[in-house]
Amino acid sequence: MAAAMTFCRLLNRCGEAARSLPLGARCFGVRVSPTGEKVTHTGQVYDDKDYRRIRFVGRQKEVNENFAIDLIAEQPVSEVETRVIACDGGGGALGHPKVYINLDKETKTGTCGYCGLQFRQHHH
């Protein structure tokens, strides 16, 4: 149940500005909770009386503001000639298992399930 709540929280839109966005759109970047604490990429934020805040006594909570989902969203869609593309995330130790993406479906754009890179078939 807790995992489902966390996933649902990730899908929520952030702020009033997001109301003008299309239904599937999401806001990216660091959000701030009502207490002024930065929210992590997983939506983690603690209440004022939460016992888990003890780890931040005497120091500030550090949140990396360069979320990977933001960096992937900045990548343009790659145009390829073939109808099946293999994505390995860059290969080697920095990549992920090789997956094959079929680009002749109705979606017209294929997205890698591991790294989020998008591919589109270039028709000539």
Curated annotation (Swiss-Prot):
Organism: Homo sapiens
Description of how the protein assembles with itself and partners: Mammalian complex I is composed of 45 different subunits. This is a component of the iron-sulfur (IP) fragment of the enzyme.
Family in the record: Belongs to the complex I NDUFS6 subunit family.
Protein keywords: Acetylation, Disease variant, Electron transport, Membrane, Mitochondrion, Mitochondrion inner membrane, Primary mitochondrial disease, Respiratory chain, Transit peptide, Transport
Topological category with respect to the lipid bilayer: Peripheral membrane protein
Transit peptide start and end: 1-28
Transmembrane intervals: none
GO biological process: aerobic respiration; cellular senescence; circulatory system development; DNA damage response, signal transduction by p53 class mediator; fatty acid metabolic process; gene expression; kidney development; mesenchymal stem cell differentiation
MF terms (GO), sorted A to Z: electron transfer activity; NADH dehydrogenase (ubiquinone) activity
Subcellular location as annotated: Mitochondrion inner membrane
Listed InterPro entries: NDUFS6, Znf_CHCC
Stated name of the protein: NADH dehydrogenase [ubiquinone] iron-sulfur protein 6, mitochondrial
Function: Accessory subunit of the mitochondrial membrane respiratory chain NADH dehydrogenase (Complex I), that is believed not to be involved in catalysis. Complex I functions in the transfer of electrons from NADH to the respiratory chain. The immediate electron acceptor for the enzyme is believed to be ubiquinone.
GO cellular component: mitochondrial inner membrane; mitochondrion; respiratory chain complex I
